[in-house]
Structure formats: structure tokens, C-alpha cells
Amino acid sequence: MYTVDASVWVNAFDQREPGHLVSRQFLEVLRDQALPIIVPNLVLAEVAGAISRTRQAPVQAQAFATALSRLPHVTVRGLDEVCALHALTLAAQHGLRGADAVYAAVAREAGSTLVTLDNEHLTRLVNLITVCTPAVALAALTPPPQLPA
């Protein structure tokens, strides 16, 4: 199971961003293999806001975030009091921004791998949860090419 940070969804959406193809391929592999994704409901607002700001396309931003919420292999988890308190603890103990702590809390509670482009996730949480970039996650999901016999 995976928790996919908003940075990856936005990167996959925006062809102008470095690493776009890797993020897109990673999400396509998850979709094609019907691998479960759990994300905080916060991801919807973050993705819509980021796309709207960078592309000046509010209708497209809302459509993408809505489509994300309806993917059959994606579970959108609400931020209840238990998760919020868990995120609070992670933010305080690891110096995370609030939204980053919410993703970490969801990943930790679900026992999922957090896939992110956020350097704070990648450096501050390595001893707490499994966290990696889309490139690392994609490499783990994609079998190496077969050499001719």
C-alpha cells in the first residue's frame, strides 16, 4: 500500500516539471496493478490549489483533484481527531510542516510507503516510516529487463 504526497500527483500532472515522466509512470503502474493508495483528504485541496496556481486553470485543477478522489484504487482518508493528534505529534517531534505531518500520520497508521518529492519527508522520516521518491518506488515495482538467453 502507498500514501502518495501531493507533490507527486502535481508532478505527474505538470509536464513542465522535472521528473514528470517518472511520477506519471509510477502512478500508472499503481493504477495498472490496482495497488492500493491511501491519502489524506487534504491531498485534494493541495493538488487543486497547486495546479490552479501554476497553470492558472481552476477548472482543470478541480477536475483533476475530483478525478483523483474517484480512482477505484485510491482511499481518501478523512482527518479525524486521532489522525490529527498523530500528525501533531509527528510535526512537533520531527519539525514537519502541518500538511507533511498529516501525510506521515496517514502512512504510519496504514503501514504504507510514503512516496514523495518533499525533502523534509525524505530526510526526517527515514527512521520512522518507509519513505521514498517516485523513482525508487517505480524501480521496486518494475521488473528489470530480461537479457536475451
Where are these regions (language model features)?
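Acidic, PIN/NYN-like endoribonuclease modules and their adjacent C-terminal/linker elements
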Residues: M1, V76-R77, A104, R108-A149
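Acidic catalytic patch
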Residues: Q15, N41-L42, S69-Q93
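Short beta-strand scaffold positions
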Residues: V4, I38-V39, G78, G98, ...
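Alpha-helix capping/helix-boundary segments
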Residues: V8, V43, C83, V102-Y103, ...
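Short, hinge-like loop/turn segments at secondary-structure boundaries
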Residues: T54-A57, H94, V131-P134
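Short, well-structured N-terminal submotif of metal-dependent ribonuclease cores
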Residues: M1-V39, T54-A63, L138-A149
